[in-house]
């Protein structure tokens, strides 16, 4: 009989654990987990989102209040969620998380930052009394769905990827710290060179440069070889014509001189004949 009595206690403990496990699991499911893959669900409906880190003392103190508030989510028709910034660095950049914990209220894609007391009662009053209407929403330029915040998210993800690679080089491959920095420096130079070449190629294709042709110096046009003999003949004919005209002009000048001399002689001879007759 003693052994049967001793078996009752472990069986009772086992039944208690089996009954309590689903209850505890259902309680944890009241707070939804938001990641980079499903964050766009926040754009529909009403949400309260907490950004936290496991190592943050203030975040640890907030967790019981947040879990209790999540139990009222169905009655208040609000979704209660949380984001672990250590596992989702892209979301921390997308929402510009500069302090922990940070709480956002979202209503149909409009985000407002909650800065009130962090108790269950205050959270419930904030939703039931619609106190969020008195808070100015985040500008569309800095909204999580904007191009600027998407770029910021990509930058945060890149920084986390670089950190992971750095740890892999040091811990798994055994490289020294300066060796890891050297790898990143070479990768940065190579990526910058490739990016610069790509940008130059795109700029040259979109806006080609207008190359100015040099103006030719003034020069005489050279005739083809086939026309050179004809040109020589024309030049010789022009030279002959010029010689003939010069000879004609010289002969005319000589004739004029002779005519003038004869006229002078006749005038001088005339008076002398008259004196002889007298």
Curated annotation (Swiss-Prot):
GO terms for biological process: negative regulation of platelet aggregation; negative regulation of triglyceride biosynthetic process; positive regulation of ERAD pathway; regulation of calcium ion transport; response to endoplasmic reticulum stress. GO terms for molecular function: disulfide oxidoreductase activity; enzyme inhibitor activity; protein disulfide isomerase activity; protein-disulfide reductase activity. It is found in: Endoplasmic reticulum membrane; Mitochondrion membrane; Secreted. The active site is at residues 56, 59. Disulfide bonds join 56-59. The chain crosses the membrane at residues 181-203. It is a single-pass type I membrane protein. Keywords: Disulfide bond, Electron transport, Endoplasmic reticulum, Isomerase, Lipoprotein, Membrane, Mitochondrion, Palmitate, Phosphoprotein, Redox-active center, Secreted, Signal, Transmembrane, Transmembrane helix, Transport. PROSITE patterns: THIOREDOXIN_1, THIOREDOXIN_2. The modification Phosphoserine is found at residues 226, 245, 268, 272, 278. Residues 1-26 form the signal peptide. Residues 213-278 are annotated as: Disordered. PANTHER family: DUMPY: SHORTER THAN WILD-TYPE, THIOREDOXIN-RELATED TRANSMEMBRANE PROTEIN 1. Interacts with ATP2A2. This is Thioredoxin-related transmembrane protein 1. It comes from Bos taurus (Bovine). The lineage of its organism: Eukaryota, Metazoa, Chordata, Craniata, Vertebrata.
């Amino acid at each position: 009989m003693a052994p049967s009595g001793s078996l009752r206690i472990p069986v009772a403990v086992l039944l208690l654990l089996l009954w309590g496990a689903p209850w505890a699991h259902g309680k944890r499911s009241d707070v939804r987990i938001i990641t980079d893959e499903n964050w766009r669900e926040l754009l529909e409906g009403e949400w309260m989102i907490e950004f936290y880190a496991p190592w943050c003392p203030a975040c640890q103190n907030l967790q019981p209040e947040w879990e209790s508030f999540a139990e009222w989510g169905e009655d208040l028709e609000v979704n209660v969620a949380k984001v672990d910034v250590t596992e989702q660095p892209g979301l921390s950049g997308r929402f510009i998380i500069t302090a922990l914990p940070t709480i956002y209220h979202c209503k149909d894609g409009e985000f407002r930052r909650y800065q009130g007391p962090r108790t269950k009662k205050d959270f419930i009053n904030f939703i039931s009394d619609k106190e969020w209407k008195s808070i100015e929403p985040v500008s569309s330029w800095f909204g999580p769905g904007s191009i600027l915040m998407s770029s910021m998210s990509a930058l945060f993800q890149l920084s986390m990827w670089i950190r992971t690679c750095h740890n892999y080089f040091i811990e798994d491959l055994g490289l020294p710290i300066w060796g890891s920095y050297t790898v990143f420096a070479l990768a940065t130079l190579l990526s910058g060179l490739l990016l610069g070449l790509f940008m130059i190629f795109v700029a040259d294709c979109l806006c080609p440069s207008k190359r100015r042709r040099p103006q030719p110096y003034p020069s005489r046009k050279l005739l083809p070889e086939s026309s050179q003999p004809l040109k020589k003949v024309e030049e010789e004919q022009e030279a002959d014509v010029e010689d003939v005209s010069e000879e004609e002009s010289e002969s005319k000048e000589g004739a004029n001189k002779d005519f003038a001399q004869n006229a002078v002689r006749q005038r001088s001879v005339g008076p002398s004949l008259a004196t002889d007759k007298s």
